[in-house]
Structure formats: structure tokens, C-alpha cells
């Protein structure tokens, strides 16, 4: 499940990282709007139309119009070009003349000293603007390259940082279940290995211990290895502590985490075996021996031959029960 989720998320994460780190060209579009200014006509030339003059307002280059103004301007069939000039010491007449040569039908300039305005009739409209028009005058030279568009660096960097943080959180959220599954899987394997060797309490007479060669007695604690071999706890624990690798003394099968991960329980003929595990051989033999003794105790032999016959019958019954249990 975790691999399937990662396979589904990986392409989206790679595309997101590529979009965040890649540089793309940016185009800025300027919306043109119509603005009305309060103006007064100059005391010369043709009077201003009472309906007011409307045109396409452009900033003069250079802004003070002390030299020839750059032109022509972009063609606009609906409006005539109007020039916006910043007064920096040049005469008003020279400014109007340069605007006329550049193709403008009107010029908007600041006032000169009183009494210095002289009229000339060939310039159609000349307007004297107050403070609202001066707001449009730039404080620095305009960008000479038409492809140069200013970009707010701070906002672009912030947008990239937010996109990178969001993509990182998304990838970590998708990978967290997979990492947590790996950790829980390792814990489950360790617990399962520790539970392979179990300590049980012996309740019936059975075989002897292969280490000390003593018979198992009722009430003794035995340790059963995954290979189904059982030993006294007092015998197998020193064996594991001295051995370089933990293995069964009889079959030499490796039994990892047997000594430290032992669990306590009780073994008896009445208790069912562990789920998924067959009962060990010594337990089956103990059951057969007890069953055989019960059958012998029930039969009361009167003669030697009858005793032999009863013993043979008991052994046949015990063998049939053992065959059914092993199957």
C-alpha cells in the first residue's frame, strides 16, 4: 500500500519541484485608463474647446523637453497624442514648439513666471495643468528596453518559499505511513522471534533431558525450542550463555532470542497446543504413556495370559490414538 502511494505521489512531487526551481519569462500588461484633470487654458493660441480636449497622454522624453522630444508615438486612431512635460527651466514657448514638432496636438506644462507667456497661433491647444497632472511625471528615467518589465523580488521569493514548503509537507505526509510501517514491521518480527522459545511447566512424566540425562518430573520448568526439543531451564540457560551462537544441543538448529525472549506458561495434556504449532514428540509420548497406564489399571488380570492379552490390547489402542494425533 505504501509503495503504491509513493508511486502515485512521485510524479506530482517531481513536477512541483521543477516548477518551483525553474525560471520562466514574465510579461507585464499595463491597463490604460482615462483620467480627467482640472486645467486652465493658456493666454494665447486658439481657445480651449468648452467640451474639453481628450487625447492620449504621453510623457515627454526628455521629461523637461529642453531638447528635441522623441517621436513619433504609437498610432491611436481614436485619440490624439498629448505631451506631459516637467518644467525644469526651459521656456514655455520652446517646450510647446518641440511638442508640436514631435507630432503632438497639445502640451501640458507647468506655469512659468507671470507675464512670460507669449502666444503663437499655430499650436492648436496649450493647457496649463496644476498638481494632479504632475503626479504622472516619473521621478526617474523610464526603462529604455520595451522588453524590460519590473518584477517584485520579495513577492516572487515568498511565493517560491511557500510552494517549496507546501510540496515538502505533502511528500512527507505521503511517506510517513510507509516509514511507520517499516518500524512496526521490525518490532513485530522481533516480538515473534522472542516468542518462539517458551517456558512451560511440566505436569506429566515424560522423557529425560538431553543435557543432564535426568527424567522430567512433575512441576519442573522446561524450555521448548522452535525445533520442538525440550530441556530443563537450569540446563539450557547456561548452555546458551556459554555458546557463541545459540543453537539446539541436539539438532544444532539456530534459535535466536531464545534466552532473553522466553515466556512463561504451563504444559499439560489438557492444554491445547499453540495455534499454528504441532505438539512436541515428548508431549505425545507422555500422553500415550498415561493412556496406557489407565488402560492397564482398568483391566484386572486373573492369569498371566490374560494379563499379556490385556497389555497387547492396551498397546494397540494407544498406537491407534498416537497415529490419529500425529495425522
UniProtKB/Swiss-Prot annotation:
Keyword NADP: no
Keyword Electron transport annotated: no
BP GO terms, sorted: protein ubiquitination
Residues carrying sugar: 31
Enzyme superclass (EC): transferase
One Pfam family linked to the record: zf-RING_2
Positions annotated as zinc finger (RING-type): 209-252
Reactions catalysed: S-ubiquitinyl-[E2 ubiquitin-conjugating enzyme]-L-cysteine + [acceptor protein]-L-lysine = [E2 ubiquitin-conjugating enzyme]-L-cysteine + N(6)-ubiquitinyl-[acceptor protein]-L-lysine
Transmembrane segments: 151-171
Signal peptide positions on this chain: 1-28
Keyword list, A-Z: Endoplasmic reticulum, Glycoprotein, Membrane, Metal-binding, Signal, Transferase, Transmembrane, Transmembrane helix, Zinc, Zinc-finger
Region described as Disordered: 256-279
Ranges of biased composition (kind: Polar residues): 256-265
Main localization (coarse): endoplasmic reticulum
E.C. number(s) listed in UniProt: 2.3.2.27
An MF annotation (GO) of this entry: ubiquitin protein ligase activity
Free-text comment on this protein's domains from its UniProt entry: The RING-type zinc finger is involved in CANX ubiquitination and degradation, but is not required for interaction with CANX.
Its job: E3 ubiquitin-protein ligase that acts as a negative regulator of NOD2 signaling by mediating ubiquitination and degradation of RIPK2. Also catalyzes ubiquitination and proteasomal degradation of CANX within the endoplasmic reticulum. Could have a role in spermatogenesis.
Summary of subunit composition and partner proteins: Interacts with CANX.
Name assigned to this protein: E3 ubiquitin-protein ligase ZNRF4
Organism expressing this protein natively: Mus musculus (Mouse)
